[in-house]
Amino acid sequence: MASFYTFRPMTAEDMPLVQRWLAEPHVAEWWHDPETLEFISGDLDHHDLAQFIVSLDGRPFAYLQCYQIGDWHVSFGPQPEGTRGLDQFIGEADMLGGGHGSGFIRAFIDRLFTRGIPRMVIDPSPDNPRAIRAYEKAGFEKSGIVDTPDGPALLMVRDA
């Protein structure tokens, strides 16, 4: 039986799961801001941000947020109208290293591209080679180092 990823809109009922994931050492290394949970829960109804729980064959294992590029993304430079940004993490440690990061990111973005989104951007820490490799496997290309409110980031882009 083939495996497939599903993307369910996140609800307030998912917050205990996301809180547990944020406490996992492999997530906390990169999502360590103490206000992260507050930002995630406070943005559940934000019109420019969609948040999802990613599942594989019915098992939740990751968090994904997709957002409209806005004024606070000036460090990304000029982007085509309709460009979206993406952030994600795999919460379940046993799902690391199996190609799931690049797999679900590619599946999600391919779906957006069929809806007319022209470009996706992502901005991992330049010190996170695992994430950078997953994004490259998902079709992203390195664009350059940018300064963000969270510090230096590697801007990566994937065009439709």
Task: Write out the residue ranges for each language-model feature.
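Active-site rim helix/loop that mediates acceptor-substrate recognition in acyltransferases
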Residues: 31-53
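Conserved N-terminal entry element of GNAT/NAT acetyltransferase domains
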Residues: 1-13
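Conserved acetyl-CoA-binding loop-helix of GNAT-fold acetyltransferases
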Residues: 91, 97-111, 133-137
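Conserved GNAT acetyl-CoA-binding A-motif
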Residues: 112-124
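Conserved acyl-donor/pantetheine-binding loop and adjacent beta-alpha core of acyl/acetyltransferases
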Residues: 68-87, 93-97
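Conserved beta-strand in the GNAT
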Residues: 53, 59-70, 85
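Conserved beta-strand-loop-alpha-helix junction that forms the acyl-donor binding cleft
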Residues: 122-132, 148-152, 159-160
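Helix-loop element at the rim of GNAT/NAT acetyltransferase active sites that forms part
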Residues: 20-34
